[in-house]
Amino acid sequence: NLFQFEKLIKKMTGKSGMLWYSAYGCYCGWGGQGRPKDATDRCCFVHDCCYGKVTGCNPKMDIYTYSVDNGNIVCGGTNPCKKQICECDRAAAICFRDNLKTYDSKTYWKYPKKNCKEESEPC
C-alpha cells in the first residue's frame, strides 16, 4: 500500500516519499500524462505501468509482506497479486535511489501538469 511504499522509499533513499516524490515531474504523484521529464520521473512512469498490470488486488490499499535483508528489500508472502505490488514498489524505490544525483527539485517539484501535454509513450 502507499504507506509501505513510503517506507521502502525512505529505506532506499533516506528521503521522504511524500516530500520528494508526491508532486514531481509528470508522473510522480496522483495520475500521470505526457512524457517523463527525467530519470526520476521515469521511475514513476514505470511504477504507474507496473501498477497498471496488477489485477485482483488494490496496489494503493492492500498490505503486502516484505523484509529488509542487508539493505535489500525482499518481497514475500503467498499472495501473488500482493507480491507483484511489492515488486513494483521495490523496483521504484531502487530506481529513486539510483537516480538521486539527477533529482532536480528546482525544475520538476510541483511541475505544472499543463506542461505534460506530449503524447504519452506506451508502457
Curated annotation (Swiss-Prot):
Which cofactor does this sequence's record say it needs? Ca(2+)
Residues at the catalytic site: 47, 89
Q: What does the entry report about post-translational modification of this chain?
A: Acylation causes dimerization.
Q: What is the effect of changing residue 15 to E?
A: 60% decrease in catalytic efficiency
Q: What is its main location?
A: secreted
Q: Which domain of life is it from?
A: Eukaryota
Q: Cross-referenced SUPFAM superfamilies, in alphabetical order?
A: Phospholipase A2, PLA2
GO MF term (any one): calcium ion binding
Q: Which Pfam families match?
A: Phospholip_A2_1
* Lipoprotein among keywords: yes
Q: What is its EC number?
A: 3.1.1.4
Q: Which cysteines are joined by disulfide bonds?
A: 26-116, 28-44, 43-95, 49-123, 50-88, 57-81, 75-86
Assigned keywords, A-Z:
Calcium, Disulfide bond, Hydrolase, Lipid degradation, Lipid metabolism, Lipoprotein, Metal-binding, Palmitate, Secreted
Please tell me, according to the UniProt entry, what happens when changing residue 6 to R.
75% decrease in catalytic efficiency
Could you say which residues bind Ca(2+) here? 27, 29, 31, 48
InterPro entries xref list? PLipase_A2 (IPR001211), PLipase_A2_Asp_AS (IPR033112), PLipase_A2_dom (IPR016090), PLipase_A2_dom_sf (IPR036444), PLipase_A2_His_AS (IPR033113)
One CC-aspect GO term:
extracellular region
Question: What does the UniProt entry say about where the protein is found?
Answer: Secreted
Q: Which family does it belong to?
A: Belongs to the phospholipase A2 family. Group II subfamily. D49 sub-subfamily.
Q: Subunit structure, briefly?
A: Monomer or homodimer.
UniProt name for this protein: Basic phospholipase A2 APP-D49
| Origin species | Agkistrodon piscivorus piscivorus
What is this organism's lineage?
Eukaryota, Metazoa, Chordata, Craniata, Vertebrata
